[in-house]
């Protein structure tokens, strides 16, 4: 048993010694670790400094990317976020370096000294205990051997009292071996605990360092997200992103607003800007873009409606200021510009879409309510022209006469309640002129040679042949000379108007290639419903100066009423200033952009790509007599379009103008005067308001197409003596005087140019 115990104790002692030897042999490893950790911490400090400098430069790059106009704002933002994450990593790295030196290296160095002491102490304690135990066992074993020898001697002598002592000694030896074994086991445990404790201490020192490192490396996930963003932003370096395109659009929009916000505002600010940019392409597209298609009118409506049907281009005339919906489409104008399937005889049609009723005996034989609508105009004509045409509530197309056409043949325009900027104020006045002619048509005067029968020609009589029924054959030449004088004076005074009409409601941007001729510019001018005309020479110089610096519709009553008020305004545009004399056709200036063909010379801004506009010199009929009013007249020749509208709107027919006209204030007589001058005459069948419209209609009818009548082929028939009225002699002179006096407008009480009022 002693040998077994000895063997076990030797094994335990050997294990202890091995453990102690391992612990003592681990010191160089720990020391090397501490050394390398110190070097790492030193490098981390250097890295932190270098990282700080690197991130400063990185931030500058990110700021540059953010502030660059090359469309890298998103890239700069992502780089800034990445830089911020790297800043955070830098801070974590600082903390990691501090933890490495404070929590691992320095404590481990201190612990190494303790570990060495503990290992040495364990080895000493074990050696001491083992030596003591072995000494006791040896002593007991020695005593036991002595007792055994003594016992043998006693047995040989026959004595038996020594045996119990021997047994006790052997037990003591066994106990000592057991104690030694236990001592060895304890020593081994202590050695194992010490060795394990060292690693536990090391882990406790390493944990703060690892935690700081984990916190630092936790920023990697954010870097991964930012890296994906940068990858998507820089996927295609040769393609501009939407933000870069927006930069270009912003710059373009800024330049555009800078270019087009310079002109002053017109009276109607909403229509001025639009109409100024959209006011001139129609003169290049020489067609009446509103003269095709069908028109349907509600019987209860007093407004003119225009469909949006696009007209084809007619190649005959170039239109800058021609009257496209001045009330009637003259024969020559129809032949040159209307692409609709109507025959050339369909001249007696209102430009507001109504078919002008037949002037044959059948038409005016009916009652007033059922006859052609020129018979009975409502009393609303005495009011200022709020609606361009106040029509009575008649049937849809009235009585069917030779001049009637289906709705598909009636020219129509867009559904606007106001006339276009090139409208002539002839809608109502020409109706009254027709009204005046109806009794003459009933008189059955001789028809023109080569013309259709009287009844059919009355219905199809071109309105361009505006003649006076009150002119005697002997007075034709004198009246024509007076008319020519008035027209010549009016043409000289209307120097500005050829460009005014094309630039109606324009604030300066009126090039001919600005907008298409069918642009849906449907903004009506609120200041163009009152058009007053003047051929008085003393007002025209002042008017020219005013028109150069005003963006009000040039020929409206507003512009004349406020003429002196706006003389100090700066010029809105020099595009409309004329360089040559030319006749003018005054229009009710709505911001429309469709124009009918006209050869009227107009001074316009040169086209960007279309070249100069062909301009015809106006022809003034000086020696040609005016045809008297007849029941039927031949259609105007093809040269009518060139001469139509070359007279001032104020030009009256020769010999027309009643005796009472001279007594009427000139402010009450104009193309669109609120109250038309009364015309006392011997025709009781015509109501008073219709007689009032006669001189006005004659004047504007003559203005519409007088030359076409004068150049009509064939003999000029003389009017029937039954058709002559007693107001023949002084009519032309009084009318010319009224025209020369011009129009005097009443003062208004408001400064609002877009909403004039007349007291």
From Swiss-Prot:
The record's subcellular location field reads: Cytoplasm, Cytoskeleton
State if Acyltransferase is listed as a keyword: no
What are the recorded Gene Ontology BP terms? Answer: actin filament organization; actin filament polymerization; adherens junction maintenance; bone mineralization; cellular response to fluid shear stress; epithelial cell proliferation involved in renal tubule morphogenesis; glomerulus morphogenesis; in utero embryonic development
* Residue numbers spanned by region Disordered: 259-309, 331-354, 431-472, 569-759
Gene3D superfamilies attached to this UniProt entry = Arfaptin homology (AH) domain/BAR domain
Q: Which Gene Ontology terms cover its molecular function?
A: actin binding; actin filament binding; actin monomer binding; identical protein binding; signaling receptor binding
User: What are the UniProt keywords, alphabetically?
Assistant: Actin-binding, Coiled coil, Cytoplasm, Cytoskeleton, Phosphoprotein
Stretches assigned to coiled coil:
108-157
What effect on the protein does mutating residue 747 to A have, as reported in its record? Answer: Loss of actin-binding
User: Which stretches does UniProt call biased (Low complexity)?
Assistant: 612-627
Residues found modified as Phosphoserine: 265-266, 275, 326, 648, 651
Domain (WH2): give its ranges: 731-748
Cellular component aspect of the GO annotation: actin cytoskeleton; adherens junction; cytoplasm
Magnesium as a keyword of this entry, yes or no, is no
Quote the InterPro entries the UniProt record gives: AH/BAR_dom_sf, I-BAR_dom, MTSS1/MTSS2, WH2_dom
What Pfam families is this protein classified in?
Answer: IMD (PF08397), WH2 (PF02205)
Expression tissues: Strongly expressed in the developing neurons and skeletal and cardiac muscles in embryos. Strongly expressed also in liver, outer layers of the kidney, and in the Purkinje cells of the brain.
Where composition is biased (Polar residues), the residues are 660-670
Q: What information about domains appears in the record's comments?
A: The WH2 motif at the C-terminus binds to actin monomers.
What function does this protein fulfil?
Inhibits the nucleation of actin filaments in vitro.
Subunit relationships: Binds to actin.
What is this protein called in UniProt?
Protein MTSS 1
The scientific name of the source species is Mus musculus
Q: What is the lineage of its organism?
A: Eukaryota, Metazoa, Chordata, Craniata, Vertebrata
